[in-house]
Amino acid sequence: MPRLILLIILSLTLSCCGEIDSPPPQSAVPEATNIAIADLRKLVDGRNVYIEESLIVGGYITSNDKASNFYKTFIIEDATSAIEIMAGLYDLHNIYPEGYYVTLKLKDCYIATHFGVLQVGRKAESYSNYPTEYFASRVLLDRHAHPVK
């Protein structure tokens, strides 16, 4: 009898595991992009570029701050290249988990390369050693980055 009760409790415990945090299926990926990340890299060509056009890039999140190896940033990647989003927020892995697809509206953003890494963010201050600045606000970040859940 105790074994039966233990077996029932164990089976109920294991059956409650759901796929709450799993990434969305690939069929949920929107077709809203109009430029590849590799084309952005060619556009930058060693400069800090302000984007005035309605450019939209998309990619899967491949790295975030969960393992503490990226500070306040996350990286999206498409089939051509990758770009670092200078979010400026803590615990980004809760908002942008690995495997999610993100479309990024680049209008009114700055893009540049820093040590070979393509970055998107706000305009850096004149005294800054960095080519782009963090968005540093969830409101600003939400205007540009849209994850598919």
Where are these regions (language model features)?
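Sec-dependent bacterial lipoprotein signal peptides
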Residues: M1-C17
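OB-fold nucleic-acid-binding modules
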Residues: C17-Y71, I75-K149
